[in-house]
Amino acid sequence: MKRKHLITLICAIACVVFLLIGILCSLSIQVTHYTVTSSNIPKNFDGFRIAHITDLHNDEFGTDNDTLISLLESAKPDIIVITGDLIDSYNTNVDISVSFISRATQIAPCYYVCGNHELRMPNEYASLKKQMKAYGVTILEDRSAVIEINGESIQLTGLVDRSKLSAQQVSHLTDSTYYTILLSHRPEHFSQYMEMGADLVFSGHAHGGQIRLPIIGALFAPGEGFLPKYADGMHTNNDTTLIVSRGLGNSSFPIRFYCPPELVIVQLKAQ
């Protein structure tokens, strides 16, 4: 075999291996752990564990989401926060999402905000909300809830999904006397979340870019464009920390590449 043909063959094999690894490594859920430290976290919330679910898009991991539920159970969260797109507007199956909710609420109290896919389907979303409420899910649509442990409290605030957001629209929802955790579907509004005075923000929406390259990372994300800054990971600016999950499911574009589905577990640490 001529040297030129050999090099071509080696390059072709390398490309196939690269593609296969990228696809295969994106089939299983990756559990990512973060520790968030702040002097604003009450002492009684030191060690408080939060599981973050986002962008399930009525997908399933194992029969009836057994794999996802098992990972949640192993994490032993104190609460589960869900930041939207439980259902998918292109391939809707409310029953899958409701079945997941019925099992997740047996693990820990669940707090939910909607994503853009729910808002595209008002009838299906109304059905989903009704069933989630029946299972005890706290739905935070531009409202807040307080969690108390032995006389100390933190605040959870949730925003209805908006493609455009002004901090002035929603700043009344947060109370600076609490350590405030904000649930909002879109990470691209990080600067507005800072203006609101949120201490910790959970978001999804970007799917980690879905197509990622080693070293480079995400190539594109909705709402952020090419080479997005907030496709995944933990980002801190001033006193606000944003945690963006790559999410779990897919929507109209069915492939993830070097972008595993993600379950995020956050532990609070009082300083």
PLM regions and their residue ranges:
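Conserved beta-sheet core of the metallophosphoesterase superfamily
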Residues: 187-264
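Beta-strand-turn-beta hairpins that frame and shape the catalytic cleft
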Residues: 37-51, 137-138, 145-157, 175-178, ...
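Extended recognition/assembly regions associated with phosphoester-bond processing machinery
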Residues: 20, 32-38, 174-183, 188-189, ...
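N-terminal membrane-anchoring alpha-helices
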Residues: 1-44
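Active-site metal-binding loops of divalent metal-dependent hydrolases
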Residues: 53-58, 84-86, 116-118, 143-144, ...
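Membrane-embedded segments
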Residues: 48-138
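Binuclear metal-dependent hydrolase catalytic cores centered on His/Asp/Glu-rich metal-binding motifs
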Residues: 122-137, 143, 149-192, 196, ...
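Short, Asp-centered acidic motifs that coordinate Mg2+ and/or phosphate
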Residues: 78-79, 111, 137-138, 154, ...
